[in-house]
């Protein structure tokens, strides 16, 4: 397998992909609160609520995104579609900042952009780092250094983004925020193009097998089947029972948190999802004891 300075070349593809994605994320965040208060003219309390809800959901959705990648999509598909959704979100933010003369449109574009970025981050964030470990044999002494290199990319993107996007967007003129969002959008688009065009060239296991295509759970079950290890299955009655449990739990939590938080529907959604998502995953009868 091709290598560079003692590491698989796939590591440097993951490094570049993560650097670009973290640039787009932290670049947008660096100017977002200023955009809300100076361009969209939200008061500080409302702006802080939107910003806090966005960042909270960004850290919540990887829970379900990782589950989907592990069970259904596989890592490559999750990374690709996560980056695509984030790119759409960043360009919607650019369009929002370009539509300040139409306040309602600017608000809707902003909320749409946040939604796409939240969903995209949920798919991308928990999966891209897991590719690193699959490039090496278990117990490989280079693995610690590989993760150090990977997180160097994360830190480089996180450090450079506020400087560049802040310089472009925070000029004192509300019309200029769009340039900061555009820079973030371009970097996210670069993430999509880079990963999609290079993944088949560099992402291979030490044995030469492509990594990240088959969902981990499906691959592990095939291996266990070959070794005659059985896994539990859900029958239709169990599936119906689980649907009823999740529905009843969701309705009950929404009612409770609606009473507790009054009209703050974003907090209601976050707190409800924090409980429902783990329960949904735990009710999956196909989970193994290890999972």
Protein language model regions, located:
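Hydrophobic core of transmembrane alpha-helices in multi-pass small-molecule transporters
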Residues: 19, 89, 103-124
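Cytosolic juxtamembrane N-terminal segment immediately preceding the first transmembrane helix
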Residues: 1-25, 101-108
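Interfacial helix-cap and linker-helix signal at transmembrane-aqueous boundaries
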Residues: 36-37, 68-72, 100, 164-174
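A gly/Pro-rich, aromatic-decorated transmembrane alpha-helix motif that marks the paired
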Residues: 29-30, 63-64, 156-171
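C-terminal ends and interior cores of transmembrane alpha-helices
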Residues: 81-105
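Short amphipathic helix-loop junctions that connect adjacent transmembrane helices
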Residues: 30-50, 170
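Intracellular loop-helix junctions on the cytosolic face of multi-pass helical membrane proteins
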Residues: 1-9, 138, 166-291
């Amino acid at each position: 397998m091709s290598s560079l300075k003692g590491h698989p070349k796939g590591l440097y593809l993951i490094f570049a992909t993560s650097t670009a994605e973290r640039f787009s994320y932290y670049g947008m965040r660096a100017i977002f609160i200023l955009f809300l208060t100076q361009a969209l003219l939200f008061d500080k309390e409302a702006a802080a609520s939107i910003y806090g809800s966005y960042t909270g959901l960004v850290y919540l959705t990887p829970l379900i995104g990782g589950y989907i990648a592990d069970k259904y999509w596989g890592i490559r598909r999750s990374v690709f579609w996560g980056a695509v959704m984030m790119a759409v979100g960043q360009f919607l933010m650019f369009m929002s900042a370009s539509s300040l003369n139409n306040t309602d449109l600017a608000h809707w574009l902003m909320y749409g952009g946040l939604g796409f970025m939240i969903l995209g981050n949920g798919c991308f964030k928990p999966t891209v780092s897991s590719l690193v470990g699959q490039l090496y044999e278990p117990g490989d002494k280079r693995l610690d250094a590989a993760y150090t290199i990977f997180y160097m990319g994360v830190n480089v993107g996180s450090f450079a983004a506020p400087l560049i996007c802040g310089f472009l967007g925070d000029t004192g003129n509300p019309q200029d925020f769009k340039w900061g969002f555009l820079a973030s959008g371009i970097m996210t688009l670069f993430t999509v193009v880079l990963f999609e065009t290079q993944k088949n060239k560099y992402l291979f296991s030490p044995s030469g097998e492509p990594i990240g295509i088959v969902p981990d759970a499906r691959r592990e079950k095939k291996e266990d089947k070959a070794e005659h290890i059985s896994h539990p299955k859900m029958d239709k009655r169990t599936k119906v029972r689980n649907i009823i449990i999740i529905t009843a739990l969701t309705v009950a939590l929404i009612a409770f948190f609606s009473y507790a938080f009054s009209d703050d529907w974003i907090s209601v959604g976050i707190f409800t999802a924090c409980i429902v998502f783990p329960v949904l995953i735990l009710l999956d009868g196909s989970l193994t004891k290890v999972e």
